[in-house]
Amino acid sequence: MALLRKINQVLLFLLIVTLCVILYKKVHKGTVPKNDADDESETPEELEEEIPVVICAAAGRMGATMAAINSIYSNTDANILFYVVGLRNTLTRIRKWIEHSKLREINFKIVEFNPMVLKGKIRPDSSRPELLQPLNFVRFYLPLLIHQHEKVIYLDDDVIVQGDIQELYDTTLALGHAAAFSDDCDLPSAQDINRLVGLQNTYMGYLDYRKKAIKDLGISPSTCSFNPGVIVANMTEWKHQRITKQLEKWMQKNVEENLYSSSLGGGVATSPMLIVFHGKYSTINPLWHIRHLGWNPDARYSEHFLQEAKLLHWNGRHKPWDFPSVHNDLWESWFVPDPAGIFKLNHHS
């Protein structure tokens, strides 16, 4: 009897151990793969870098902003976060246009720009009053508007993106450079563009070299200029170098001494940037900023060249939603109709 009792005890012990092993395996099998699966599903999202794109939406040209956003979103698989900047009286309209159109799927934030930061920094100028609009200076204040990003893309509203914006975002900024721009002398079609009457591509076209403050900079007037309508910016360097403060200093000096004006090349927003960033910026692939499409309504690019371009910019007076203008078919293909019916195309005289 004693032997039988011991055998039963051993069998019972083995049964308990077996049950424990089975239970452990079942629990382990049910949990570990789930964690692995979670890791596999979450890792791509965690590793996918968010690309912040800053673009302004002015009341009278909001359709331009929406077309630009549509072209960017439609030509990339990247994770884009649009920062749409406007004045207080336009914020509701911006949101309604996005949420009640094909753009409703985009990831976006609406940012209010307070024009009071410009008080005393803009000299009244009647030659091109549109260049004095507050949103034209948003690019000066990027770190104050965008906080959690190391690298940011800024775009003017009168652009269309035909390439993958990821390529532009991947632009390499040299050590110590706060921004990258496209040089005006590096355009692939420079010979054709330079035939446009009044086009400037040097500092002489932007700064008044008769003024002592400009002469004292020691910058040759024949130095190639750049266009700040497309910017890839490093926010850490921007803040470290106090770029915004430097720009404001030259804005105030212009109010006092009239160092530049919109009657010259790029007007009041480009000139201070040319001064502050002189010799301290990286370059963007020229195909990522094909510009001057709004300079002359009679000047046209070849179709082949336009197809090669990654980004088209209608800088100048002749906008593609208005008349007269050129290559407006390329712009209109990305146009998002205004749900409120306020913004309308004007392609006829």
UniProtKB/Swiss-Prot annotation:
Subcellular location: Membrane
Xref: Gene3D superfamilies: Spore Coat Polysaccharide Biosynthesis Protein SpsA, Chain A (3.90.550.10)
Annotated Gene Ontology cellular component terms: Golgi apparatus; membrane
Topological domains, Cytoplasmic: 1-6
Molecular function in Gene Ontology: UDP-glycosyltransferase activity
Similarity-based family: Belongs to the glycosyltransferase 8 family.
The name this protein goes by in its record: Glycosyltransferase 8 domain-containing protein 2
Organism of origin: Homo sapiens
Lineage: Eukaryota, Metazoa, Chordata, Craniata, Vertebrata
